[in-house]
Amino acid sequence: MEIGTFYMKKGNYDAAIDRFAEAARYQPTLARPWLLLGETYEKKHDKAHAIESYKKYLEVFPGAEDAAKVQKRIATLEEKAGQQPSKRPTP
């Protein structure tokens, strides 16, 4: 994931997404790749994939300290994408 973070900081979002997706594929119960995927997709202005990744992050790690912040990001992205915001309860 460190290589993915490097690519993200350099603005090479496609390479970063490849690395984070690979980490998520091999360790699907690890939360961090899903969060980083969401952030990278968001930087790439890919709202649908960002939302999907953030939701997976919350599914894998529902007790995350930043859960409320991530839920707010999801709602904001859904609003911008013209979707009905999710009705997820706050843990």
Give the predicted meaning of each segment.
Residues 2, 36, 70-73:
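Canonical tetratricopeptide repeat
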Residues 24-25, 59:
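Conserved structural position within tetratricopeptide repeats
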